[in-house]
Amino acid sequence: ASDDSAADDSAADGSVFKIGSIGPTTGDAAIYGNAVMNAAQMAVDEINAAGGANGYQLAFNAEDDQNDAEKSVNAYNSLKDWGMQILMGTVTTTPCVAVADKTAEDGMFEITPSASSTDVITNDNVFQACFTDPNQGTASAQYIADNNLGTKVAVIYDSSSVYSSGIEATFVEEAQNKGLEVV
């Protein structure tokens, strides 16, 4: 976990806004979590160096969920205990779906930068900053058809991955709608 110490110093007078984040910083999906956490920490540091946001310094605390739903819920509870006021995350879909129900129960605002399944946004308090899986599959098939890049296409995907399967399903559907032959 990372905290911005300058922001923590201002917490005593109530002028700090606490941002929590959850994502894989270790394990097979760490490349995604580390990219998000590093970018968020850079943004917090830049905002704080420029005087903060509307009179508030930002504190950022990132928790590792190892791309595991149960660990993600535990991380969420830890961040709540820390005093988190907004959740940026989680980074990957399965943990995000698990945490979204908890944030809905608590009325916590949640925005995911990268969990792309439509299952993520079933609660009114959860938002996606990225495109959804169906958008990716549909747009890819449309691009191939609209730019005459071929009439026969093959799809290679990981059937054990919710992310990959979601894109594949909408790609195949749109490819067929566009007259492409999926082999």
Tell me the role of every PLM-derived stretch.
Residues 15-24, 58-62, 152-155:
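Short, well-ordered beta-strand elements
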Residues 16, 31-36, 50-119:
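Beta-alpha junction/loop-to-helix N-cap segments that form part of ligand/metal-binding clefts
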Residues 25-31, 62-65, 84-86, 124-130, ...:
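Second-shell loop/turn segments in exported
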Residues 41, 70-80, 97, 138-146, ...:
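Amphipathic, non-transmembrane alpha-helical secondary structure
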